[in-house]
Amino acid sequence: MTEIPGWLSTEIRTGDAIERLASKLKEMSAEPSRAFFARDAENILQSGAVVLVGSRYGVMGLNCGWCGFPTCAEKTGQAPLAPCAFNTNDLGIAVGSAVSVAADHRADCRVLYSGGVGALALDMLPGCRAALAIPVSATGKSPFFDRKPL
């Protein structure tokens, strides 16, 4: 696992790890609100690699109020398990940068919330509380383009 200074971690998974992640998503798709996880599992199986980007939770000490509390100390005291707004903001920036690099190299990819949930359930990003998955494909046609509707 690569730890980016601050709160972010990344992993690149291939082979059996892709199979495990897809299997976990299929299992999780039994819950009605997560039926789309089964479709996303198929996309993961069509990829050569999955990039995982995760964030640990911790306050940045900026007292910005974006979390709904006036100070970081109040947020930590009253909602210690809630993310600092900057934790998820930084996660989004990192994922945007990763898919941009993939596009620059003409690799097809898609950002999957479901893959991040599955990766967290499998503890693929130890210590992280939020994650997104980016399946990557280098085939003739993008498997992420003509996704079947639910």
Predicted feature residues:
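Acidic, surface-exposed loops and disordered segments
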Residues: 1-150
